[in-house]
Structure formats: structure tokens, C-alpha cells
Amino acid sequence: LDKDGKILMRMGSDMHVMPGEKRGCVGCHEVREGNSTPINSPSIAMSKAPARPTPPAWENDGILDYQKLIQPIWDKYCIECHSGPTPEGMVDMTGDRTRYFCMSYDNLIEREIVDYHNVFALGHDENTPKSLGSFVSRISEFIDTDEHSGKLLLDDEKRLIYTWIDANVPYYSTYQFTRPETRGVP
């Protein structure tokens, strides 16, 4: 992560690890062409002491829940202008429910205001640092300064938004709410 909490590089896939399970990176993070790194040549990361991540400021056990964590930021800073029948720029940032998500989420995705990894799209080749996620998301134009709205987001709020983007813009906090027939969290 950089100093603002934006991810420098990310994987094009995800993995789930249960408590007590261990996961290594051998297989993906090796030289693809040629010989592997010699065993007696430790990586930079392995030559340092383990670092314990700082728990996120938003609590919620670190679980990203759009309606619970992200929407309140839009409510605080955006809906004054971006709501109603003719929202500013025709971008509705309210939490009003849509078929699967809500107006703000749909607008951010459909208008490409946030960059995400569309798992259904083609062409997921290797990427370069700072080429995906929060680094290239247009939302930065609106939240990094107070020029857009005259309001300045708190650093923790910006970091939460960047984390949400770099986690690939999850909406539901658990799989329990990911089916159309479920109502999700009200």
C-alpha cells in the first residue's frame, strides 16, 4: 500500500482462508520463464521480521459491507447534491435499493467511477503496478480534495473507500445476501 492506503499491485484472483489454515504463494509468484529463485536466495520479504497488520479504523471485524460502511460516507458528503429526480451530473449517490444493490453502487460501477476487476470480462493478463483499482479510479477526483463539494473527507474515510475499491468493490458482506431472492441487509 502507498501512504494513502491505495494498493500498488493486486492479484487478479482471490482466495479464502479459514482460521487455522495456511496459504503460501509458491506457484504463482515465481519466475514464469526460466529457473526458479535458488533456495539460498531469500526474498526481500523473507529477510524482514513479520509485520502485523494494523486493524482497520472502521472496525466491523475488517469485513467490508457497502451499506454499513461505504454508503454512510456518500450520505454524509454527496447526497445533498446527488439525489432526487435530477441529481447533479445525473449521478444518484443514495442508498435507495435497486434490483440487486443500490443507486450509488450501480452508478459508481456503471459510470466507471471506480475501477474493478470484472471477473466475467476477457483479457485478464498480468498487470503493472498502479494500473488498477484505487490508483486509476475516477472517484479520487472527487474525494482527494474539497474542490468538488467544498467538503473534505477524513483520511480514514478515504482509506476505507480505497480499501473497498481495492477489495474489488464488494457489496454484500457475506454470501448469505448474494442471491436475488434474498433481501440483504435493509
PLM features per residue range, with description:
Residues L1-P186:
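Aromatic- and Gly/Pro-enriched helix-to-coil junctions and flexible linker segments
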